[in-house]
Amino acid sequence: PTQLYLSEKKLQDIQMLYQSAETIQVDPISILAFGDCLLITDGHHRAYQALLAGRDTISAEWDRDGGDELYHLYAQACEERKIYSVLDLKNHILPQDEYEAKWYNWCDGFNQAVTLLLKRKADEIGPTNR
């Protein structure tokens, strides 16, 4: 995973979809290759709910939006917190307002720190070595 929390509300909305139809049509999740693993970049809630519903497959598509380096860092942050699978987010399900506050604040801070580090790294390389 590349996400630290799940929203209780989003999970409930997806669960309603699973309960309301025999043939469930949910958007595919987005993934990136990272070493020998696949990282979810979008669709953590859908993947979590699919696993809870007993599904062993889910539709996925390659994430072509860029930001691969950043997602790899997000995945490392998850691993540091012992989040190796979307099922590991079971104890990280929050009410919607708390989810938004914690997750979006964390992302903003993390992204700013990474941007500064990458800029510093580029400055150290200097224009002659680029």
Q: Where do the language-model regions lie?
A:
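Short alpha-helix boundary/capping and kink motifs at helix termini
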Residues: 1-41, 45, 51
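Basic- and aromatic-enriched surface patches that contact anionic nucleotides/nucleic acids
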Residues: 35-130
